[in-house]
């Protein structure tokens, strides 16, 4: 029979962090996953604009205009039952995406079904708004740590290149952790590979 590629849902929006979107997207596509990248009020082929965040000596990250990223699916057509897992990008988009009730619903549906969920950098801002972190260990961009604590989660400070796994949730602080979070996420979805 035909091998059906596992589908992953990726939530992103304008000024999503460039590396935190494109790197996991391409890595999962390379492995054969179908990655449906969606944004509220947008359809497949519509563009979101990425932001490039970095540390250049100021007290917080700098931001530069990144690339145009073409969405691969329609937000309004999302049925969470079709997906093996959810990946939430970081950057500036999580702050406003969490104001869309359907975004919150989507997150809660993945947690209710105990499906793998990954969130990087500012991505956990969506998890805190969805009230799904009670009793869970999670990391994030350090400035999001207080939100995790207030949401009843346990904020874990780790190196930017690391990821934290608690059950079917995997989180990472920033784009140096792209490899770690993507690796743990696909493991949670049952992927096995050998070199």
Predicted stretch roles:
Residues 3-113, 126-137, 145-195:
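Extended, subdomain-level signal for the structured scaffold at the beginning of enzyme domains
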Residues 120-123:
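Short, thiol/selenol-centered motifs that function as redox-active sites or metal-ligating centers
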